[in-house]
């Protein structure tokens, strides 16, 4: 059984990327193949991705769009608060985290961005229900601030508002970006299209829980946060066609991976083939997991002891990922949301400690 300590590593803080590179495709790409021994590691630029994949392969993107979900405000008493919208639940309602000296009670009015008032409704641990006076998405877009990850040390600016979104983001609802997609620009997508590489999208609204640390040494005791996803029939059809022609299904990002695998696992448990799905998932992928859909994965470099590091270790192999991360640190790759990327190939033999 793997423990939390098995997923720890020392990362020089200067390797945590604080800003995006001027060009999306200028980031580096570490191609990793753990199906051979020793693992094959190839240093590339992300612009070289088309040379790593083949005509007839399918790239699956997450088209969620990051909300300007962060607000500063005050209580009627004048006490300062910070609000992070976690999920829009209705036209005028949302779930949110509230940081305050004292938690507000139901019926409390909060002033946000010195622009409008919201009313606190029922508690849905660990969140509060907020009632907005106008459509949530309109007020969030107009008055909110982009929520950057906790390890990025500057406040969001105009550059972040562009670069912390994918070029294909179209469904507002996330509070964190599906960062593997940040490396794609329109010319690269057009080049892949011209090659005959297929594209499809799903939606998974990334929650703030993606940054939630694992606090138990026995990782089997960790409880994942839940996120909403939508897997459309058009994607299901493209996966079937890709399988029929012998192509690879390539998930762009761990969020795409989690949605695909959650839907496939649910379908298998129900004794039916993969089908269009709208659902919640708290899937927690660790070494020993049997992958059902995804053959290859584009992903960034993840935090020590994180659930996402466990996911990529399950996919490519624990020792393969350890070797890849050692190499990336030695070669001064940039880490986390604004950092560089990896292209991983699935290990067909699940690992157990």
Curated annotation (Swiss-Prot):
Catalytic reaction annotation: 7-aminomethyl-7-carbaguanosine(34) in tRNA + S-adenosyl-L-methionine = epoxyqueuosine(34) in tRNA + adenine + L-methionine + 2 H(+)
Function, as annotated: Transfers and isomerizes the ribose moiety from AdoMet to the 7-aminomethyl group of 7-deazaguanine (preQ1-tRNA) to give epoxyqueuosine (oQ-tRNA).
Key words, A-Z: Cytoplasm, Queuosine biosynthesis, S-adenosyl-L-methionine, Transferase
Enzyme class: transferase
Entry GO CC: cytoplasm
Pfam families registered for this protein in UniProt: Queuosine_synth
EC number(s) per entry: 2.4.99.17
MF terms in GO: S-adenosylmethionine:tRNA ribosyltransferase-isomerase activity
Pathway this chain belongs to: tRNA modification; tRNA-queuosine biosynthesis
InterPro entries per UniProt: QueA (IPR003699), QueA_dom1 (IPR042118), QueA_dom2 (IPR042119), QueA_sf (IPR036100)
This protein's name: S-adenosylmethionine:tRNA ribosyltransferase-isomerase
Keyword Secreted: no
Similarity-based family: Belongs to the QueA family.
Residue runs in coiled coils: none
UniProt KW DNA-binding keyword: no
GO biological process: queuosine biosynthetic process; tRNA wobble guanine modification
């Amino acid at each position: 059984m793997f423990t939390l300590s098995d997923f720890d590593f020392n990362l020089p803080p200067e390797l945590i990327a604080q800003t995006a590179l001027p060009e999306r495709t200028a980031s580096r790409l570490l191609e990793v193949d753990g199906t051979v021994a020793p693992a094959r590691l190839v240093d590339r630029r992300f612009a070289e991705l088309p040379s790593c994949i083949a005509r007839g392969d399918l790239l699956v993107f997450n088209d969620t769009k990051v909300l300007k979900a962060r607000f500063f405000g005050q209580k009627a008493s004048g006490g300062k608060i910070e609000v992070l919208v976690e999920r829009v639940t209705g036209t005028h309602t949302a779930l949110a985290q509230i940081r305050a000296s004292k938690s507000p009670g139901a019926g409390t009015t909060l002033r946000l961005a010195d622009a409008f008032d919201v009313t606190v409704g029922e508690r849905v641990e660990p969140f509060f229900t907020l009632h907005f006076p106008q459509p949530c998405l309109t007020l969030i877009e107009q008055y909110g601030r982009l929520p950057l990850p906790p390890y990025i040390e500057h406040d969001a600016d105009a550059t972040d508002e562009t670069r912390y979104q994918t070029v294909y983001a179209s469904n507002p609802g996330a509070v964190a970006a599906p960062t593997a997609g940040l490396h794609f620009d329109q010319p690269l997508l057009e080049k892949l299209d011209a090659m005959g590489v297929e594209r499809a999208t799903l939606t998974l609204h990334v929650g703030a829980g993606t940054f939630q640390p694992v606090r138990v040494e026995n990782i089997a005791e960790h409880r994942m946060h839940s996120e909403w996803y939508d897997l459309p029939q058009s994607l299901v059809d493209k996966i079937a066609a890709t399988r029929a022609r012998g192509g690879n299904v390539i998930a762009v990002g761990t969020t795409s991976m989690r949605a695909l695998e959650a839907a496939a696992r649910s379908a298998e448990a129900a004794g039916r083939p993969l089908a269009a799905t709208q659902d919640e998932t708290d899937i927690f992928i660790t070494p020993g997991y049997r992958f059902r859909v995804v053959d290859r994965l584009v992903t960034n470099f993840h935090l020590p002891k994180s659930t996402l590091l466990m996911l990529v270790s399950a996919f490519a192999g624990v020792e393969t990922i350890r070797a890849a991360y050692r190499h990336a640190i030695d070669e001064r790759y940039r880490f986390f949301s604004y950092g560089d990327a990896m292209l991983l190939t699935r290990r067909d033999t699940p690992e157990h400690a």
